């Protein structure tokens, strides 16, 4: 199995996936075995379900957040037992949660990628300030938070409080959108996937939704999810 594109929708493409596809295609031909192609997003969701011991959700509809460096999307997943079939319900209309975190890291002089550093810094602050992003249906914009973070840091000169401020904003927005989605589709399980889903504050604040999270080390592990999906295709 191999990731061949960011999302399983028409027109989804990034050239970086060609290297993996080329190698996997050659190996499949040499070994005389099938080649199963999936999206990067499908891999992250499957990795979360496997790591959380919830592969049973491959049989039932659920909500899934894909939170990463390039993506912040809320999905309705209607799996068929072998693959993750998803419809986008909402998410960011501009920069992703991961991009916002990395840009905040750059502002604070942190190494790239900044996820772990922002997580550690934010835990050292009790700042409760936040900028509440408005929802438009289930869509929202994170670019305004970046501007607010720059102003906040200029006013406070506190890296820890700024990191906490940004995470307060992100987590509040994700929670608001999740509540709104559950109001439309009550009773569905909520799965969190992607690298940003390893953030400790996010994991704590989402408890009200009885969430399904991957173990932190598997939040960033797309390959594990691709292996799981390949095994399911083979009936293993």
Language-model segments: which ranges?
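Glycine-rich phosphate-binding loop plus the immediately following alpha-helix
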Residues: 39-42, 78-125, 147-156
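Conserved phosphate-binding catalytic cores of ATP/NTP-utilizing and phosphoryl-transfer enzymes
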Residues: 33-63, 228-229
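Active-site nucleophile and cofactor-binding loops and adjacent substrate-binding regions
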Residues: 12-19, 35-43, 65-67, 94-95, ...
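Glycine-rich phosphate-binding/hydrolytic loop that grips phosphoryl groups
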Residues: 44-48, 214-236
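A contiguous, well-structured pocket-lining segment that forms one wall/lid of small-molecule binding clefts
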Residues: 119-190, 196-213, 231-235
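Short beta-strand scaffold segments in enzyme catalytic cores
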Residues: 46, 64-66, 72-76
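Short beta-strand-loop/turn "lid" adjacent to the catalytic site in phosphate-handling enzymes
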Residues: 1-23, 29
């Amino acid at each position: 199995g191999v990731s061949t594109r960011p999302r399983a929708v028409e027109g989804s493409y990034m050239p970086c996936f060609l290297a993996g596809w080329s190698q996997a295609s050659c190996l499949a031909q040499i070994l005389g075995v099938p080649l199963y192609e999936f999206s990067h997003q499908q891999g992250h969701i499957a990795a979360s379900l496997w790591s959380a011991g919830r592969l049973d959700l491959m049989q039932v509809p659920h909500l899934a957040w894909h939170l990463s460096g390039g993506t912040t999307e809320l999905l309705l997943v209607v799996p068929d037992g072998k693959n993750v079939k998803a419809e986008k319900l909402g998410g960011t209309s501009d920069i992703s949660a991961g991009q916002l975190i990395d840009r905040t890291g750059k502002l604070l002089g942190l190494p790239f990628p900044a996820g772990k550093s922002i997580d550690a810094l934010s835990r050292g602050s009790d700042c409760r300030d936040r900028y509440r992003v408005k929802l438009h249906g289930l869509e929202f914009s994170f670019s305004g938070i970046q501007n607010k973070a720059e102003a906040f840091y200029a006013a406070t000169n506190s890296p820890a409080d700024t990191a906490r401020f940004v995470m307060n904003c992100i987590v509040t927005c994700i929670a608001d959108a999740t509540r709104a989605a559950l109001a439309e589709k009550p009773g569905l399980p909520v799965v969190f996937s992607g690298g940003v889903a390893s953030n400790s504050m996010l994991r704590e604040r989402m408890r009200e939704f009885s969430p399904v999270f991957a173990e932190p080390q598997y939040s960033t592990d797309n390959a594990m999810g691709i292996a799981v999906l390949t095994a399911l295709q083979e009936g293993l």
